[in-house]
Amino acid sequence: MEMSQRRFKVGDRIRIIRMDGEPEYSGREGVIEHISTAYEPAGILEQLHGTWGGLAVQPSMDTIEIIQQGE
């Protein structure tokens, strides 16, 4: 994903609908504090880090929704 194609921004409030392999994260909400890039064999993955817990969300693999856009 190119930087200009990002849908998510620092400050956005999201809800995790489904996190791959982590059912206890379903329904959690939080604010995106940092966005990073992971270089995996499958390609470049965007990772969202925030106030919902210790794990990063990967929008290409996990199901999330923006519930409030940051300013």
How should these model regions be labeled?
Residues 4-7:
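Short, conserved secondary-structure segments in the cores of folded domains
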Residues 9-70:
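Basic/aromatic-rich interaction segments and small domains that mediate binding to polyanionic partners
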